[in-house]
């Protein structure tokens, strides 16, 4: 509780339909779990969130803002990393651009890349680190071959199952327009209260889709409102209802991310290959049906007026999978493209996050995760950053002390 990041429980009394959700979940074998991040994850419970007094506790707010005044910290906004500066097999800096101005930052100790699962492998490839055939295809001279760069991409793939609710005031939709929205805005501005200061996903179910599993392998995240897509925007619907985000927790479908050009501004080729693994197809079908079972159980079934999506006519495996492929979305949890491990042939960084075969270079972001976490990647990424900083500082102290560590 003394760290920089505040973690809070979603207040149970502030979530519409919660008590009905708990009662229905218990009837289908999912007990109320007061701590989904505790000893056991299974059941229905409230989200634990990085929100305090209605404000999201981002890394910028918790870590960067307090450090902005330090003399040993320089922040370059609007900078685009172009490539790493390599001297042989040692990384000594980063080439970057601010607007049209090319610049270079030199390191006296180490370079730590934290560009994320999409851009970290791309930056390595632009620097000549990766699969030789990928690099040569772009006209980049290979400096160091690491075949796992850009491979092993995984993500949480989520169809949205939607239900219309007949009871007035039972969802956030009623408070998202007119004078009620004005009231919510005032509550948020004065006290950080109301639904504007809450997570959009206050309720979660974790469960096993098949016998023999040690831990839950699927989740249904419940949004107590309906929303609509208008172009690239999401807007709360005028219609009253709930949305269920369905996820297979540890996806086995593997994709890739690779540079497409020597131009650092060019987007990479991202191939998720969602649902390519049979286990993922089976898991998402079971999870959709679990969500439907919940909503068809008292006391929820009495207030459900309609299944909006995928709809009551979509029932068979093939029909459901076709609907998922056309409607599911990423949850923006990509991992694994610079995966950690001891084998340079199948991984990119070692257990201390050092890039295999390149001195002075570490990676600290979700790309180093060997597989997906059974939840959001936000907190794990903060842990990776803290651990990487600790290891880099320890290595520096060892070097200065002259002590040999074996």
Residue ranges and their predicted role:
Residues 47-52, 76-87, 218-234, 238-245, ...:
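A glycine-rich dinucleotide-binding beta-alpha-beta segment and adjacent secondary-structure elements
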Residues 141-143, 206-214, 279-303, 317-326:
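Flavin-binding catalytic cores
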Residues 140-161, 301-315, 393-406:
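Active-site-proximal substrate-binding core of FAD-dependent oxidoreductases
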Residues 33, 74-76, 141-145, 221:
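General small-molecule cofactor/ligand-binding pocket signal
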Residues 1-91, 97, 160-183:
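Conserved redox-cofactor binding core of oxidoreductases
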Residues 371-392:
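A conserved FAD-binding loop/helix module that cradles the flavin
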Residues 83-184, 194-195, 249:
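Glycine-rich loop(s) and the adjacent beta-strand/alpha-helix scaffold that form part
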Residues 162-285, 322, 330-336, 346, ...:
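FAD cofactor-binding and catalytic pocket of flavoenzymes
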């Amino acid at each position: 509780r003394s760290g920089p990041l505040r973690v809070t429980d979603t207040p149970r009394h502030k979530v519409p339909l919660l008590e009905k959700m708990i009662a229905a979940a218990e009837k289908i074998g999912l007990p109320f779990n007061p701590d989904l991040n505790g000893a056991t994850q299974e059941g229905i419970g409230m989200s634990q969130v990085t929100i305090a007094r209605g404000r999201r506790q981002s890394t910028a707010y918790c870590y960067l803002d307090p450090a902005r005044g330090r003399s040993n910290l320089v922040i370059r906004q609007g900078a685009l990393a172009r490539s790493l500066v390599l001297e042989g097999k040692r990384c000594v800096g980063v080439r970057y651009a601010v607007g049209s101005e090319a610049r270079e930052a030199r390191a006296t100790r180490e370079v730590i890349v934290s560009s994320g699962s999409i851009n970290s492998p791309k930056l390595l490839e632009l620097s000549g680190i990766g699969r030789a055939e990928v690099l040569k295809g772009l006209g980049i001279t290979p400096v160091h071959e690491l075949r796992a760069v850009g491979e092993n991409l995984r993500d949480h793939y989520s169809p949205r199952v939607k239900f219309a609710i007949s009871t007035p005031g039972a969802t956030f939709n009623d408070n998202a327009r007119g004078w009620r929205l004005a009231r919510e805005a005032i509550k948020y501005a004065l006290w950080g209260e109301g639904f504007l200061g809450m997570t959009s996903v206050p309720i979660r179910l974790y469960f096993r889709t098949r016998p023999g599993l040690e831990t839950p392998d699927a989740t249904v995240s419940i949004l107590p409102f309906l929303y609509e897509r208008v172009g690239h925007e999401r807007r709360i619907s005028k219609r009253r209802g709930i949305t269920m985000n369905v996820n297979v927790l540890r996806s086995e479908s593997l994709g890739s991310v690779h540079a497409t050009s020597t131009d650092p501004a060019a987007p990479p080729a991202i191939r998720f290959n969602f649902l390519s693994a049979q286990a993922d197809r089976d898991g998402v079908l079971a999870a959709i049906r679990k969500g439907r079972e919940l909503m068809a159980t008292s006391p929820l079934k009495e207030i459900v007026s309609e299944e909006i999506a995928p709809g009551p006519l979509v029932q068979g495996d093939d029909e459901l999978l076709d609907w998922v492929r056309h409607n599911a979305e990423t949850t923006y949890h990509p991992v694994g493209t610079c995966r950690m491990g001891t084998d340079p042939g199948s991984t990119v960084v070692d257990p201390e996050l050092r890039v295999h075969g390149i001195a002075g270079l570490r990676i600290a972001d979700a790309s180093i995760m060997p597989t997906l976490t059974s939840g959001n990647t936000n907190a794990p990424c903060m842990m990776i950053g803290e651990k990487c900083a600790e290891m880099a500082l320890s290595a520096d102290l060892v070097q200065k002390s002259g002590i040999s560590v074996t």
